[in-house]
């Protein structure tokens, strides 16, 4: 049984949002790094850093909140494609999340990208997760 680092990342972000924690540390894999960069570009997180701890490289994600009540910018993160059931889509069938308010993160032949880029480039791929 292998480690599902994407599921771990999603769970850490979800739990941190529930506890209103400022930062989250996750294992730095290429997939996690790419997804975190997308979240930073789309404005869901405030900051992204990498740090070395002994032999492990960790991503330190600073979550973004709004207002005095600290409402998280990431309302929901939902993993779609899982180890037991992969979900693929061509560019025409990529779903829209909340009418375009959320994003779909895909793994394609051109790297990990969001749904808008995939539609523009007319490429499909594996649907990793929804974020809104």
UniProtKB/Swiss-Prot annotation:
Query: What is the similarity comment for this entry?
Result: Belongs to the universal ribosomal protein uS8 family.
> Cytoplasm as a keyword?
no
What is the protein name stated in its UniProt record?
A: Small ribosomal subunit protein uS8c
- Note the InterPro entries from the entry: Ribosomal_uS8, Ribosomal_uS8_CS, Ribosomal_uS8_sf
Please explain the role this protein plays, according to its UniProt record: One of the primary rRNA binding proteins, it binds directly to 16S rRNA central domain where it helps coordinate assembly of the platform of the 30S subunit.
Q: Please name the GO terms of the biological process aspect recorded for this protein, alphabetically.
A: translation
Q: Gene3D superfamilies under this entry?
A: 3.30.1370.30, 3.30.1490.10
The record ties this protein, via Pfam families, to:
Ribosomal_S8
Quick one: a GO cellular component term?
chloroplast
- Please report the organism this UniProt entry assigns to the protein: Staurastrum punctulatum
Q: Which GO terms describe its molecular function?
A: rRNA binding; structural constituent of ribosome
From the record, give the cysteines joined by S-S bonds.
none
Tell me which domain of life the UniProt entry assigns to the organism this sequence originates from.
Answer: Eukaryota
Keywords of the record: Chloroplast, Plastid, Ribonucleoprotein, Ribosomal protein, RNA-binding, rRNA-binding
Q: Fill in the subunit field for this protein.
A: Part of the 30S ribosomal subunit.
User: Which compartment or compartments is the protein found in?
Assistant: Plastid, Chloroplast
């Amino acid at each position: 049984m292998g480690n599902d680092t994407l599921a771990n990342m999603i769970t850490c972000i979800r739990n941190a949002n529930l506890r209103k924690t400022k930062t989250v540390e996750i294992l730095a894999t290429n997939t996690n790094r790419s997804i975190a960069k997308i979240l930073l570009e789309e404005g869901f997180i405030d900051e992204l850093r990498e740090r070395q701890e002994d032999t492990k490289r960790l991503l330190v994600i600073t979550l973004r909140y709004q207002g005095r009540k600290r409402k998280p910018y990431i309302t929901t993160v939902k993993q779609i494609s899982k180890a037991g059931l992969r979900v693929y889509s061509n560019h025409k069938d990529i779903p829209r999340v909340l009418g375009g308010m959320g994003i779909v993160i895909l793994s394609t032949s051109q790297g990990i990208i969001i749904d808008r880029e995939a539609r523009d480039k007319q490429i499909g791929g594996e649907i990793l997760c929804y974020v809104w």
